[in-house]
Design a protein with these regions (language model features):
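Transmembrane-helix motifs of polytopic, lipid-linked glycan transferases
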Residues: 19, 23, 92-112
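Perimembrane helix-loop-helix junctions
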Residues: 2-7, 179-211, 281-286, 331
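Membrane-embedded, lumen/periplasm-facing catalytic core of multi-pass transferases
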Residues: 155, 347-413, 419-420
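Signature aromatic-anchored transmembrane alpha helix within multi-pass, membrane-resident enzymes
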Residues: 18-22, 165, 207-211, 265-271, ...
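Membrane-lumen/periplasm interface segments of specific transmembrane helices
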Residues: 28, 201-273, 302-309, 313, ...
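Specific aromatic-rich, kink-prone transmembrane helix
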Residues: 104, 124-127, 143-162, 166, ...
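Hydrophobic/aromatic-rich transmembrane helices and adjacent perimembrane loops
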Residues: 141, 170-173, 179-180, 258-269, ...
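Short helix- or helix-capping micro-motifs
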Residues: 22-26, 118-129, 149, 153, ...
Length: 528
């Protein structure tokens, strides 16, 4: 397809595109809408919205104060208040943001290259595992990415002040969204050659407008809490401990992989590199178009800014932090295929298929459950375990770790009807199991689960493992069988799904709990 051909999508406005894209996204995510909340959703984002809805506090009271701006929590609180405290309500609300983001991706790509590349880019972005999963999760990263992509589109259209409004909304969704305006300000100041030096300074100053609402939020947070950022533990984990040159170097390597290789993105990166060896395809109207080089350089600068910022800051190397950059990578890749491959639709379709496969098949390296549909396995296993506890352990104190501690104490998260008394450990490593055994008299039941996905590395390096443990929280959970032997307990419920597992151990002598467990799942039954 060439851009000289008439395409009905050339005339589609935002008002016509957004409902169409939202309906498609909704249908793709329909099987996931009723899942209870997962990991950081349960640990912060939903409780923060709960606090805002019930105590009208912009700063979280009943959960960790991360210092994040309040727009994302306010958005969720609005939908919860209007439609009720149900996970499906939040997921549909997030799909609206995903549809908004994808609509801006389409309009941006159509303006820069044409409708054919716009369709390919939008479809590939929608099914790219990391973006797909985040589309229905309540993390602030999706809202920040949606407004950031809107701002980038308006910026490339020359609509300077509307773009700053979009970036301001992005910054009020999550403070790290300031990365893109800073990158564009740097572009205007150092690399944009049109206009005088004074003109470049003025444009750079305009690009820095989103700093103002961020400063206002930080001032409010300081006035309210006495801190500019989140609580001491959160700040230490995400900033103080991260400021290490060796950690930065190691994180930069992993961040580069996350952006250009993770979750089958390597296929598109390789295809893009291979296509560069071919000359541009020439038709009756000349060479096929490409994204203008200055715009590509702006995109590269935005990508580089994300890589550097999230290598320097942030305790966990979560791929969702790079969410605004992924559509830019995909757009450049699809544009390159379109420009240099005659029948470019075939490799573009292959990339989409490869991304879809990444949703269902785990990669042969370590990854987070939220990078593909493994998170669904995690949630479903935890839901089954919570229901077992409700049926058979109502009067017991439970030993477990986060996020199960929130799942079992906050009924609005969708796991339990009433809270359980808990004893908390950090994880289920050998060290924590020793602590658990020392606290043996304080609990009757242990609820264990996989806190990390342990995939055997391609090349085993003890030094690399030590560095991962030191800087990135890597650890190995003991198996349910080892934990049962160590804690002198009996496994009364055990379920697995690929790399994820949950186990419930009864600490007392054989009792009615063990006998009723046999009716529920069989003695030491494994549910696949």
């Amino acid at each position: 397809m060439t851009t000289s051909q008439t395409n009905p999508l050339d005339e589609f406005s935002f008002r016509r595109l957004f409902p169409l894209i939202f309906v498609i996204v909704f249908l793709l995510h329909a099987p996931l809408l009723r899942l209870p909340f997962f990991w950081d959703e349960a640990g912060f984002y939903v409780p923060a919205a709960y606090d805002l809805a019930h105590s009208h506090s912009l700063i979280a009271k009943t959960t960790l104060d991360t210092g994040h701006p309040p727009l994302s929590a306010a958005y969720l609180a609005f939908w919860f208040t209007v439609s009720g405290w149900n996970p499906a309500v939040a997921r549909v609300a997030m799909l609206l943001l995903a549809g908004f983001a994808l609509t801006n991706v389409f309009l941006l790509a159509r303006r820069l290259v044409g409708s054919g590349v716009a369709v390919a880019t939008t479809v590939a972005t929608a099914v790219f595992p990391i973006f797909f999963v985040q589309s229905s999760l309540t993390h602030a990263d999706l809202m920040a990415a949606a407004f950031t992509l809107w701002g980038i589109r308006l910026y490339t259209e020359g609509r300077v002040w509307p773009s700053q409004l979009a970036f301001c909304l992005a910054v009020l969704s999550k403070e790290t969204a300031i990365i893109t305006p800073l990158a564009l300000a740097l572009w205007e100041l150092l690399f944009h050659r049109n206009g005088s030096g004074r003109g470049r300074i003025e444009k750079a100053a305009i690009a820095l407008v989103p700093v103002l609402p961020l400063l206002a939020w930080l001032a409010y947070h300081y006035h309210t809490t006495g801190r500019f950022f989140g609580n001491a533990d959160f700040y230490q984990y995400n900033v103080t401990q991260a400021l290490n040159p060796l950690r930065f170097f190691l994180a930069l390597i992993q961040r580069t992989w996350h952006l250009f290789g993770a979750m089958n993105m390597l296929a598109l990166t390789a295809a893009t590199a291979a296509a560069m060896f071919f000359p541009p395809v020439t038709g009756s109207s000349g060479e096929r178009p490409r994204i203008a080089v200055p715009v590509q350089l702006q995109f590269v600068l935005v990508m580089l800014a994300h890589l550097l910022a999230f290598s320097l800051l942030g305790g966990a190397l979560l791929t969702r932090y790079l969410l605004p950059a992924y559509p830019l990578v995909i757009m450049i890749g699809m544009s390159t295929l379109h420009r240099r491959i005659s029948r470019w639709e075939w490799p573009a379709a292959l990339m989409v298929i490869v991304f879809v496969l990444g949703l269902f098949f785990d990669p042969p390296y370590r990854f987070a459950p939220e990078d593909n549909l493994t998170y669904k396995d995690f949630v479903e296993l935890h839901f089954k375990a919570a229901k077992f506890l409700e049926q058979h352990e109502q009067n017991s104190t439970i030993l477990t770790a986060w996020p199960a501690t929130d799942e079992l104490t906050r009924p609005y998260l969708g796991y339990v009807a009433q809270s359980f008394p808990l004893v908390q450990v950090q994880d289920f490593t050998v060290e924590q199991m020793i602590k658990a055994r020392q606290m043996r008299s304080k609990y009757q039941v242990a609820y264990l689960f996989s806190t990390k996905i342990d995939v055997p590395p391609w090349i085993r390096s003890e030094r690399w493992e030590k560095l991962n443990r030191r800087f990135f929280g890597s650890h190995v959970d003991v198996s349910p069988e080892v934990a049962a032997e160590f804690l002198h307990g009996k496994i009364v419920f055990l379920a697995r799904s690929k790399a994820e597992w949950v186990a419930i151990l009864e600490m007392d002598q054989p009792s009615s709990v063990a006998s009723t467990a046999q009716k529920f799942c069989g003695p030491q039954k494994t549910a696949d």
